[in-house]
Amino acid sequence: MAIIFALVARGTVVLSEFSATSTNASSISKQILEKLPGNDSDSHMSYSQDRYIFHVKRTDGLTVLCMADETAGRNIPFAFLDDIHQRFVKTYGRAIHSAQAYSMNDEFSRVLSQQMEFYSNDPNADRMSRIKGEMSQVRNVMIENIDKVLDRGERLELLVDKTENMQGNTFRFRKQARRYRTIMWWRNVKLTIALILVLALVVYIAMAFVCHGPSLPSCFK
Amino acid sequence: MSFQDLEAGTRSPAPNRFTGGRQQRPSSRGDPSQEVAAGIFRISTAVNSFFRLVNSIGTPKDTLELRDKLQKTRLQISELVKNTSAKLKEASEADLHGSASQIKKIADAKLAKDFQSVLKEFQKAQRLAAEREITYTPVVTKEIPTSYNAPELDTESLRISQQQALLLQSRRQEVVFLDNEITFNEAIIEEREQGIREIEDQIRDVNGMFKDLALMVNHQGNIVDDISSNLDNSHAATTQATVQLRKAAKTQRSNSSLTCLLILIFGIVLLIVIIVVLV
């Protein structure tokens, strides 16, 4: 949690405060309220103590103070102070000028708690943080895209190898098919020649019988 | 120039026309016209002086004394205009009622015209003075406090010094306040700049990723083209192989027919041989 302590005061009179953890922020903030320079003039201040920074905003006589981590910067704490100031003025109006010390603490400390939670954890509290989050998401999506494209590249490499093998196989298949066709053709030629020879032989033998001799003497006389 | 012509015009016909009653008639009839001429001359001189005063408005010469002099001159001119107007009216009435000569009527008309032109100039000067008096304020000289008493002067100076001290103090506080505000705003701006710079870095990274992705996709496009050409070649080779196999099948069918025919012939020959042997 970035914002740990919050306080609303009129001058040095504390009207409401909330602390997320048990610290001495309350006493330190009272000292800060007493030492604020300028008499009820609108101002923005930041005081550092150890690892924490106290941000103070005073507007129209009402002082809003919060204690935050160093890592929280200034945008989010001061946005928090602006929001608390508006909510407080909207809720209590003119009663602020005549209220007793801690008279709003029972009601408003819950609002302080909720807004501290919101501004500490929700990235929508700051437009810059939201854009950073979105850019991080875009970067993650791009990293996933690159991984998928690399994987696709590997698969495409395998596929091109397989298609090259298939191409070689089909070329070989075509060659063997052509050779088989040639073999069949020659076999057909041989059978045709054999048939012709057999027919010639049969005719010769028949004529030999009819002409009474192997040299066919009576048929050619 | 015009006044010289007027005097010449008024004096030249006098001895010719009124030879009989010279002393009585010229004095009674010449007085209004001559007084009107003199009045117009004085008005013209006063208007010129008024113009000089008006031209001093808006310059370092512009003082309260100048404004007072302007006012007095304006009143003087108004009075002169009033008197001269009355005399001009008297002269015109004398011209209408009496049997005045033609030359005198023309001279009076000329006087009236001159009077009107002088009046117009005066009105123009008045308008200019009014504009400049509104636009500029007179220079308040330091001589005016000398009319005060000594204790009043001391009180005034004390009051002024107190006011200056208070003014200086409030300005010093304002400067301190503005310094604080400037420091605060600079810190906010610094933080915002850092955030924007980080976003810029992230966008640059994403840009690099997009470029790498484009390179890889382009390279894989080449690989896909190779795959496509391999497939096309395989398809063509397979088609040709199919054609060759179809031809081979046809040839094989012809071979089967020939083989059957040969077997049939051998069968017949064998049958004949067996018959001959048995017989």
UniProtKB/Swiss-Prot annotation, chain A:
Role of this protein: Involved in the targeting and/or fusion of transport vesicles to their target membrane.
Protein name in UniProt: Vesicle-associated membrane protein 713
Domain v-SNARE coiled-coil homology, first and last residues per copy: 127-187
Annotated transmembrane regions: 191-211
Membrane topology: Single-pass type IV membrane protein
Tissue-level expression: Highly expressed in stems and roots. Detected in flowers and leaves.
GO cellular component: Golgi apparatus; HOPS complex; plasma membrane; vacuolar membrane; vacuole
Keyword Ribonucleoprotein appears in the UniProt entry: no
Location in the cell: Vacuole membrane; Prevacuolar compartment membrane
Pfam family, one: Longin
Protein's GO biological process: protein transport; response to salt stress; vesicle-mediated transport
Key words, A-Z: Acetylation, Membrane, Protein transport, Transmembrane, Transmembrane helix, Transport, Vacuole
InterPro entries: Longin-like_dom_sf (IPR011012), Longin_dom (IPR010908), Synaptobrevin-like (IPR001388), Synaptobrevin-like_transport (IPR051097), V_SNARE_CC (IPR042855)
Annotated ranges, domain Longin: 7-112
SUPFAM superfamilies: SNARE fusion complex, SNARE-like
Residue intervals annotated with topology Vesicular: 212-221
Record comment regarding domains: The longin domain is critical for the vacuolar localization.
Family the entry assigns: Belongs to the synaptobrevin family.
Cytoplasmic membrane side: 2-190
Top-rank taxon: Eukaryota
Quaternary structure and interacting proteins, as annotated: Interacts with subunits of the vacuole protein sorting (HOPS) complex including VPS11, VCL1, VPS18, VPS33, VPS39 and VPS41.
Modified residue annotations for N-acetylalanine: 2
Swiss-Prot record, chain B:
Membrane topology: Single-pass type IV membrane protein
GO cellular component terms given for this protein: late endosome; membrane; trans-Golgi network transport vesicle
Keywords associated with the record: Acetylation, Coiled coil, Membrane, Protein transport, Transmembrane, Transmembrane helix, Transport
Transmembrane segments: 259-279
Segments on the Cytoplasmic face: 2-258
Record function comment: May function in the docking or fusion of transport vesicles with the prevacuolar membrane.
Self-association and partners: Interacts with VTI11 and SYP51 to form a t-SNARE complex and with alpha-SNAP to form a 20S complex.
Record-stated family: Belongs to the syntaxin family.
Protein name per its UniProtKB record: Syntaxin-21
Gene source species: Arabidopsis thaliana
Lineage, top ranks: Eukaryota, Viridiplantae, Streptophyta, Embryophyta, Tracheophyta
